[in-house]
């Protein structure tokens, strides 16, 4: 048997001679073992080949340590950090903080072996061979002539123990030195040290007593398993790694009683409890693992998300105008400027109120009073599209509040994918971090787990569940904001008074955040679940009395959804309608007057302001004429004012707004991309509403285009924003344009010869297509009836279908005739 490492005497030919030598047998003298070394462990041919090739024969390259008879080999332990595992952090710690260069290690070994306090005169350190995996170093010393090897080894052991114990970190850094008795094999295999060594016998095995006597000096032995007939090797288990490492490096290769001992670390059979549990009990293990991962995710991410939502509401750490400190600076500077303006006779509050008409100012005051009453504030602000609901709430009612959360349902509804929906919801709530892509991954994992275990893992969540989780986290953050200034005990007149959270919230309405939910409709074909979730969430906020909730909606139908979530709650309802002509006139004139008063007479503004002043009476008359078709819709009035401020005449501004509205209607409702029936229905209503301001539902219900599903068609156009419908006890009643400006736009589309010809032709073609489809359906029904044996049996049905076909055919003929007439008229105009 050959061994792949060896301690040899001398170098070159002397080493080869030692390798070829046959060691003498060990003998017992006076009860003591006499260990004579000389057994061949590695073939000498390898060194001969290396020498012939001129290759290195160092211990690092060959695993063999060379020394002469005048040298002694000592193993120093705990010089480097031991590799107890592949990811031992101690090795990185020592690598960064301890000097481990070759020179530093040699100085350290010399200091241990021959310190100034007890030097060995003439001792020379010849070489050091590090074994970093084991944390030690082999050192060869030249023995001085006046010492024997035994004396030098004993002094080195003593000095090392004393010197390494002087450090304040000696508990961790204490080193040991042991003479090397065997032939160490210097290898860097990935055999990590353990506290158990395996002793392989090349020859008759040693007894348990012999093994103990040989290995005990290196450390406390816990157990010895001697060799048996079936197992030819023994194992020695030490209390610590140190004993096993020193024994392996100092004894390996020794020969006793013609038996050579080869020592290796015994890798303990690891009991992979967790992996076995997963392999053998997948149905239990996978849900448990997922539950643990979920708990860890909650513990890590939920506090971050709650903080992020608080930041979204309070803006404490954001560099924006909503930041608390920036608001304080703005308030200070604004108050200073306001003081100067008031001194010069300019009333800022009066100027701000000019942005609202009288009824709106009263409604703002009512809203502010409701927020201060603190009696389960649940407000529903209802008004048609463009009535200024958002501006009324966000600017004039809660504009000075620092704890407002604004949610826009329309952005959530229009999210086409689950990932986009979750990102939009998280953005509005301030919910961060969020990982939408995980949902796709977990869905795949869920399918795999279901295939393996036969049951779903429950890892994947629907967007409804994830949205509900976001709202729950937001509720926790909102409650924390509301109770930020709460103290359970206050001092009143020298006495401690206990205060409940409910009492604190009741007494401090200003501490509660305001939640504004805009464009709440109650139902939708896509992502309609958000209305139910938001209503339930808002009801919890109000019932817990931790927030004020304001819903902005256009229709009455949303009240039904809110009533289901809060069945015992009386809503405070605020209805916004179009302004009267008088209020619209006052609003527009006040805006233009304030514009003139506030303008600085710069070179760019002189012309505009002078024109307005010079033609004030003329402009006033034009404004009166423009307000008739413009109506009292807030957004339209603001757009009109902006145009006039930019230098347009009122009539010019009105004409451009009508053209813009007409273009919008054409693109949304009358283009070729729109469904044919819907487009034809829209044109019929446009023609009717261009002549009358109000059309009764009874006038529509029996028209061919609406007869199949009249209510569905009307409601769809209402939801699209073309018309608005009033209801009488839940039944459709009166139909009006969605806003007053649309009345003028309808009239413009119908009476513009060029546009009306094109749009009317499109309408007639869609009517022809519609009627042709109906005729085809009836003909398909007639065909099998005509093949029946007795025509008299289905005469009634024949006559009915024939009459329907005749009526539709007349409509087609009339439509084609009208198209021909329109075409001829257009040719004549050219």
Swiss-Prot record:
Topology Mitochondrial matrix: residue spans: 42-283
InterPro entries in the cross-refs: Mt_escape_2_C, Nucleotide-bd_a/b_plait_sf, RBD_domain_sf, RRM_dom, Yme2_C, Yme2_RRM
Q: What does this protein do?
A: Plays a role in maintaining the mitochondrial genome and in controlling the mtDNA escape. Involved in the regulation of mtDNA nucleotide structure and number. May have a dispensable role in early maturation of pre-rRNA.
Q: Which intervals hold domain RRM?
A: 197-268
Q: Which residues form the signal peptide?
A: none
Q: What keywords are assigned to this protein?
A: Membrane, Mitochondrion, Mitochondrion inner membrane, mRNA processing, RNA-binding, Transit peptide, Transmembrane, Transmembrane helix
* Example GO BP: mitochondrial genome maintenance
FT transit peptide: 1-41
Query: What are the annotated GO cellular component locations?
Result: mitochondrial inner membrane
Say which domain of life the source belongs to.
Eukaryota
Cystine crosslinks:
none
Q: Which family does it belong to?
A: Belongs to the YME2 family.
Gene of this entry: YME2
Annotated membrane topology is:
Single-pass membrane protein
A molecular function GO annotation: RNA binding
The segments annotated as topological domain Mitochondrial intermembrane are 305-830
Q: State what protein this is by name.
A: Mitochondrial escape protein 2
Localization in the cell: Mitochondrion inner membrane
Segments crossing the lipid bilayer: 284-304
């Amino acid at each position: 048997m050959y061994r792949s490492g060896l301690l040899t005497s001398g170098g070159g030919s002397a080493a080869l001679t030692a390798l070829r030598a046959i060691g003498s047998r060990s003998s017992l003298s006076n009860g003591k073992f006499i260990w004579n070394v000389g057994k061949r462990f590695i073939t000498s041919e390898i060194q001969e080949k290396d020498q012939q090739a001129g290759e290195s024969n160092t211990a690092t390259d060959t695993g063999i340590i060379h020394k002469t008879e005048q040298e002694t080999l000592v193993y120093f332990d705990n010089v480097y950090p031991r590799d107890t595992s592949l990811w031992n952090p101690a090795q990185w710690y020592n690598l960064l903080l301890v000097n481990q260069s070759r020179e530093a290690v040699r100085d350290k070994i010399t200091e241990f072996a021959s310190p100034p306090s007890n030097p060995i005169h003439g001792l020379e350190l010849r070489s050091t061979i590090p074994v970093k995996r084991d944390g030690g170093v082999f050192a060869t010393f030249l023995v001085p002539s006046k010492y024997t090897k035994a004396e030098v080894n004993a002094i080195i052991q003593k000095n090392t123990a004393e010197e390494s114990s002087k450090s304040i970190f000696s508990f961790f850094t204490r080193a040991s030195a042991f003479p090397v008795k065997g032939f160490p094999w210097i290898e860097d295999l990935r055999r990590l040290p353990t506290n158990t060594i395996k002793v392989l016998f090349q020859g008759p095995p040693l007894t348990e007593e012999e093994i103990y006597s040989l290995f005990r000096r290196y450390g406390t032995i816990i157990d010895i398993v001697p060799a048996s007939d079936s197992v030819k090797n023994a194992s020695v288990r030490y209390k610590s790694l140190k004993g096993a490492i020193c024994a392996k490096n100092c004894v390996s290769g020794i020969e006793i009683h013609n038996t050579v001992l080869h020592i290796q670390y015994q890798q303990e059979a690891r009991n992979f409890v967790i992996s076995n549990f997963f392999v053998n009990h997948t149905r239990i293990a996978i849900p448990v693992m997922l539950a643990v991962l979920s708990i860890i995710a909650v513990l890590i991410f939920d506090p971050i998300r709650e903080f992020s939502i608080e930041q979204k509401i309070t803006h404490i750490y954001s560099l924006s105008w909503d930041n608390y400190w920036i608001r304080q600076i703005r308030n200070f500077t604004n108050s200073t400027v306001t003081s100067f303006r008031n001194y010069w006779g300019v009333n800022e509050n009066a100027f701000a109120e000019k942005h609202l008409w009288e009824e709106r100012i009263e409604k703002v005051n009512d809203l502010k009073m409701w927020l201060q009453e603190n009696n389960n504030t649940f407000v529903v602000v209802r008004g048609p599209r463009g009535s200024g609901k958002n501006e009324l709430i966000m600017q004039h009612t809660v504009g000075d509040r620092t704890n407002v959360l604004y949610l826009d349902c329309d952005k959530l509804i229009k999210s086409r994918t689950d990932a986009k929906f979750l990102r939009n919801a998280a953005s509005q709530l301030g919910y961060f971090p969020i990982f939408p892509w995980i949902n796709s991954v977990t869905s795949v994992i869920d399918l795999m787990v279901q295939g393996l275990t036969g049951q779903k893992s429950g890892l994947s969540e629907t967007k409804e569940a994830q949205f509900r989780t976001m709202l729950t986290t937001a509720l926790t953050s909102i409650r924390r904001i509301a109770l930020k200034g709460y103290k359970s005990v206050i001092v009143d007149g020298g006495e401690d008074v206990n205060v409940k959270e409910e009492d604190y919230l009741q007494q401090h309405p200003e501490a509660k955040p305001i939640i504004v939910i805009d464009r709440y409709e109650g139902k939708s074909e896509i992502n309609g679940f958000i209305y139910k979730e938001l209503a339930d969430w808002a009801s919890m906020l109000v019932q817990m009395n931790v927030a004020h909730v304001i819903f902005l909606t256009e229709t009455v139908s949303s009240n039904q959804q809110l009533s289901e979530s809060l069945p015992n709650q009386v809503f405070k309802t605020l209805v916004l309608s179009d302004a009267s002509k008088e209020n619209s006139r006052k609003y527009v004139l006040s805006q233009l007057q304030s514009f003139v008063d506030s303008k600085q007479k710069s070179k760019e503004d002189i012309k505009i302001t002078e024109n307005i002043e010079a033609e004030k009476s003329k402009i006033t008359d034009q404004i009166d004429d423009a307000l008739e078709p413009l109506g009292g819709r807030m957004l339209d009035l603001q757009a009109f004012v902006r145009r006039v401020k930019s230098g347009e005449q009122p009539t010019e501004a009105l004409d451009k707004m009508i053209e813009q509205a007409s273009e919008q209607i054409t693109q949304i409702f009358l283009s070729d991309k729109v469904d044919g029936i819907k487009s034809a229905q829209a044109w019929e209503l446009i023609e009717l509403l261009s002549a009358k301001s109000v059309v009764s539902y009874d006038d529509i219900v029996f028209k061919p285009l609406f007869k199949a599903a009249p209510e569905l068609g009307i409601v769809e156009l209402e939801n699209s924003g073309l018309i608005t419908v009033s209801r009488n006890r839940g039944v459709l009643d009166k139909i009006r344009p969605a806003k007053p400006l649309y009345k003028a736009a309808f009239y413009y589309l119908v009476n513009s010869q060029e546009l009306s010809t094109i749009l009317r032709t499109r309408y007639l073609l869609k009517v022809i297509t519609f009627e042709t489809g109906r005729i085809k359906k009836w003909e398909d029904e007639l065909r099998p009836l005509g093949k029946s044996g007795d025509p008299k049996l289905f005469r009634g049905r024949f006559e009915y279908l024939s009459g329907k076909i005749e009526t539709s055919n007349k409509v087609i003929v009339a439509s084609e005739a009208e198209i021909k007439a329109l075409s001829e008229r257009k040719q004549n105009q050219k």
